Amino acid sequence: QLMDIEPHQLTDWFHAAFVDAFDWVVEPNVLGMGAFALGDAMMTKPYVSGTPYIKKMGDFCTSCKFHPTKSCPISPMYWAYFERHKDAFSGNHRLAMTLRTLQKRSDEKKANDAQTFLDVTKTLSEGKSLHAQKTLFSNNEV
């Protein structure tokens, strides 16, 4: 979701990568939950998160080469996602607090979020490692 990947690219990947990727499992889980491609027909909100939630849920950040609040691209990607799709989510009461917080973000932070999204998608689409591009994501304070 954070990268705006075409949802059927994800289902195609699952079908190619896993012999047990049956439509009745992949379609609702990948399209409905993972990609929020069905809108609110199946789920009440997209399943995306920023760095604070990831840190709270486990020790994933301890082995990462990015600093959780200074260089990690996840939170800027999170905010860029909501900025890009805020109109679609405006009537969703479960996202009201997220959208209010988004409104409070400065224009500078929003510009940094958008640039991080562009940098990450470009880097990954070129088959490069984000860790090699670590300097692109500096000053990403959450």
Which residues fall in each region the model found?
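C-terminal catalytic domain of photolyase/cryptochrome flavoproteins
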Residues: 1-142
